[in-house]
Design a protein with these regions (language model features):
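Membrane-embedded alpha-helical bundles of multi-pass transporters/translocases
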Residues: 1-425
Length: 425
């Protein structure tokens, strides 16, 4: 369904089935982990849930570096190491949180309680909440279906690009949304409109503080990042360029993806789960419209006449680069989702913008301009990454990331931003 054409290759189809069987139990473990994390967050215990995702990264690294060579055989057999890594990570993530649950006396055996009014209320609120929070993931899933019709590698390029966005989103966007939800709920229950506005305002500012420079950094450093991390073995310079196209498209929407993680809790804290669903449905439909519209534009611009003569499906299956449309469409639909939520939030009159936004945005803009100037200067001075060795790439990338980050931080401090501004929600 999501990788059409794979079933014509028995070996590849068998490998995918094996990986699916290995990783499917991860869904159970990660769901229980999320439940445990939600319980801990409700008791203001944020550290353990925030650290838990690191376990998956460590297991993936261990699977690729340690387990894969020990499986021996062909690369197709060695890739099963990553499946085992995902399975192990799911179990370890759950076990990692159990001591913290025991510390707050919440580690109990599961039991049925469907008749409890609290459980029934959670079930009523949960379904629309799941959809409203998953629009970006659903869009990406639909994008992979379309990418399967494009040239070979499009799905992988799109998936790898999504990994680069998950770092700032997972570390900062999700973390801010997680921290801010209990505060917003507390202010709403106590009818503290001032406190509600103050907490949401703080979340919005912190999100922009991270997501805007992260977006610009990804746009400028996409190829250096991909070349340094992935361009080895069978991953060629061509794959680097194609993955970078996906990063360009998706990273354009990074501020919207991150702001959604903060704006959605403003609705959930008030137990309003219907409004995010309305916005999500609109974004979902818009994403498909954007996908086909942008594919049509790129088809006319990028596909040569000799390929067009073979028919549309044959042409899009051979012309590389068309997957750029999918990344841009996801970004545009996320901005639409954010815009609708922002409009409806304003109509509820529960949020009043705090003073100082004009000066804050100006400082943010100037700091980003300084960072971009520094990165462009370094990129002009450094040789092409495709021509460097592995260690040269690592050193050059460290210089770029460190130099750009330091320039941004110094510029913000020079314009009056202080570490204490990170507090105050």
């Amino acid at each position: 369904l999501f990788s059409s054409g794979v079933d014509t290759d028995p070996a590849k189809h068998g490998l995918l089935v094996d990986l699916f069987r290995l990783t499917f139990p991860f869904l159970l473990f990660v769901s229980l982990t999320a439940l445990a994390g939600g319980a801990l967050n409700s008791f203001q215990r944020f550290a353990m849930p925030a650290l838990t995702p690191v376990i998956l990264n460590l297991c993936m690294i261990a699977g690729a570096v340690w387990l894969a060579p020990r499986l021996g055989g062909t690369p197709e057999k060695q890739i099963l190491a990553l499946g085992w890594a995902v399975l192990a990570a799911g179990l370890l993530q759950l076990l990692f949180q159990l001591p913290s649950l025991k510390g707050i006396n919440l580690l109990t055996l599961p039991r049925w309680g469907w008749s409890h009014p609290g459980v029934r209320k959670v079930m009523t609120l949960m379904v629309p909440t799941l959809f409203g929070s998953s629009v970006a993931q659903i869009n990406l899933l639909l994008d992979t279906v379309i990418a399967a019709k494009l040239t070979d590698g499009s799905q992988s390029w799109l998936s790898l690009a999504d990994r680069f966005l998950e770092l700032p989103l997972g570390v900062f966007g999700v973390a801010l949304g997680t921290v801010i939800l209990p505060a917003l709920a507390r202010h709403h229950v106590s009818t503290d409109r001032e406190g509600f506005s103050r907490s949401l305002d703080w979340g919005l500012r912190m999100t922009l503080l991270i997501s805007v420079p992260a977006m610009l950094g990804l746009l400028l450093l996409a190829e250096p990042l991909i070349a340094t991390i992935f361009q080895h073995g069978q991953f060629s310079a061509f794959d680097t360029r194609m993955t970078a196209l996906s990063v360009y498209g998706l990273s354009f929407g990074l501020p919207a993806f991150a702001l959604l993680k903060v704006v959605l809790p403003a609705f959930y804290a008030r137990q309003d789960t219907r409004t995010p669903v309305r916005a999500g449905v609109a974004a979902l439909v818009a994403n498909m419209v954007f996908n086909f519209a942008l594919l049509a534009v790129l088809y006319q611009v990028m596909v040569p006449d000799e390929l067009k003569a073979q028919g549309v499906m044959a042409a899009i299956g051979k012309q590389p680069g068309l997957h750029l449309a999918l990344g841009i469409a996801s970004a545009l639909s996320s901005y639409l989702n954010l815009g609708l939520l922002w409009y409806w939030l304003g109509k509820t009159d529960v949020y009043q913008r705090r003073p100082g936004w004009g000066g804050y945005l100006l400082r943010l803009l100037l700091a980003c301009v300084a960072m971009v100037a520094a990165l462009l200067a370094l990129l002009h001075w450094l040789p092409a990454f495709s021509a460097m060795g592995v260690w040269e790439r690592i050193g050059a990338l460290a210089l770029l990331v460190g130099g750009g980050g330091a320039t941004y931080a110094v510029a913000m401090v020079a314009m009056g931003f202080r570490p204490r501004d990170l507090r105050g929600h």
